[in-house]
Amino acid sequence: MLGKDYMLAIILVNCDDDLWGDQNLEGETGLPPGWRKIRDAAGTYYWHVPSGSTQWQRPTWELAEDPGTGKEGIWELRPPKGRSFSSLDSSLNRSNSLTWYNEDSYVRSLEPGAKCFAVRSLGWVEVPEEDLAPGKSSIAVNNCIQQLAQARNRSQPHDGAWGEGQNMLMVLKKDAMSLLNPLDHSLIHCQPLVHIRVWGVGSSKGRDRDFAFVAGDKDSCMLKCHVFRCDVPAKAIASRLQGLCAQILSERVGLSGEAACCSPDPISPEDFPRQVELLDAVSQAAQKYEALYMGILPVTKAMGMDVLNEAIGTLTGRGDRKTWVPAMLSVSDSLMTAHPIQAEAGAEEEPLWQCPVRLVTFIGVGHDPHTFGLIADLGCQSFQCAAFWCQPHAGGLSEAVQAACMVQYQKCLVASAARGKAWGAQARARLRLKRTSSMDSPGGPLPPPLLKGGVGGAGAAPRKRGVFSFLDAFRLKPLFSICPKLILEGWGKRLYTLPVPRVL
């Protein structure tokens, strides 16, 4: 038997009549603005129309002064004890409640590793291709979140959005994001993960439950940013999505390395997630940023926002901004270099600071959104932090360095798979030579060089062990092990976490 809360939800969702004109919905006098009184078979309850929340208790006015003074009253929306129609109230995490349309059994029937999240679609906004460049993508995504959230609050829906304003179940599984109807679990939309270009989480006040992703629409041939309001902090969805993309990348690289001995075709960029391909294309040329070079400082650990903030604070306290050196920071996919701006024209002067991208272990934006720092591994358990002061903020520089790290990691994976392919081609050549020798000399032994390096000989094992131990090293370690802080919006108020791969 369904509980009262769930019965209310079913009645409202399946009601075909005009709810506003229904005689059971009463705009009773004395209720705070936005509240309606509803009577049905489940009983009498109160519905807050703007938020969709319901409660059994009659909402009350809380007067700032005595009611007899005639001053305007102030009302407060107290936490409802009933079911919220605007959300599923973390229904997937309930342990002691009744099922709603076999919801719990559906969750149990999902494939291992799949995760469900209760969301509501706010619609989509078209995004130009140029807005997805490093330094711009986070701003573009956050603008989409703000635009759709504000439009939704003004009850001005964006035309053409599938499922807009509808409660959904977002199911993240191995290779796709599925959006389902929470009542009958019918499929509303299926989005392959490899086609998702960018995703993000709102960071301004009240937007930490807004999640957005950008993907191409095959019908309209445009990039669309889809925005959702979540019942849980949206970072949970972003983290799960990041883990699935990392898993796809590692599996494809592993398969490419093992299948190289069977396929003569070179590794195609299509074998890797689209997000990494974009970073590779963007980072072909060095990007330059003006910043104040604050200096370097030895640190004790390779990663950690606390370590980075402490180092930035120490460098900030050593002197005021006048003592910092104006520099032009050049960021490529392999090297970062800071030159004094006064000496930019003359290439003879030594750079202020230089660091290969492969040595970077951690990046982040400090408490002051103008400050950016990174930690580099110098070897022998020695780590160094370099800090810069940026204007108007450090978001563009942080995204450029993140992109360089991911491109460097992609190149490392491609190189490892290419080495596996080269080993497979060499093994096939030896196998053909072995067969030819066997036909020409049925009873004769193979030449000593082939015995030493032939298939199954002593020479093949070290190569095979070397390739697979290299791949296993990445499988044993988290694919994205660094978590720098990158800002979407609200500088100095909230830091948004994005992972950056470490290149060994």
UniProtKB/Swiss-Prot annotation:
Which positions fall inside the WW domain?
Answer: 29-61
Keywords assigned by UniProt?
Cytoplasm, Nucleus, Repeat
Which GO CC annotations does the UniProt entry carry? cytoplasm; cytosol; membrane; nucleus
> Does the keyword field hold Iron-sulfur?
no
What organism is this sequence from? Rattus norvegicus (Rat)
Under the GO molecular function aspect, what terms does this record hold? Answer: amyloid-beta binding; low-density lipoprotein particle receptor binding; molecular adaptor activity
InterPro entries found in the cross-reference section? APBB1/2/3, PH-like_dom_sf, PTB/PI_dom, WW_dom, WW_dom_sf
Please give the tissue specificity annotation from the record for this chain: Expressed predominantly in brain and testis.
By its UniProt entry, which Pfam families does this protein fall under?
PID, WW
The job of this chain, per UniProt, is described as: May modulate the internalization of amyloid-beta precursor protein.
Say if the entry is tagged with keyword Repeat. yes
Q: How does it assemble?
A: Interacts with APP (via intracellular domain). Interacts with APLP1 and APLP2 (via intracellular domain).
Which CDD domains would you find in this protein's record? Answer: PTB1_Fe65, PTB2_Fe65, WW
Question: Which domain of life does the protein's organism represent?
Answer: Eukaryota
Broad class of the protein's primary localization: cytoplasm
Compartments where located: Cytoplasm; Nucleus
BP terms from Gene Ontology: negative regulation of cell cycle phase transition; negative regulation of transcription by RNA polymerase II; positive regulation of protein secretion; regulation of DNA-templated transcription
Domain PID residues, every copy: 111-278, 283-438
Q: Which SMART domains does this UniProt record tie to the protein? A: PTB, WW
Q: What is this protein called?
A: Amyloid-beta A4 precursor protein-binding family B member 3
Matching PROSITE patterns: PID, WW_DOMAIN_1, WW_DOMAIN_2
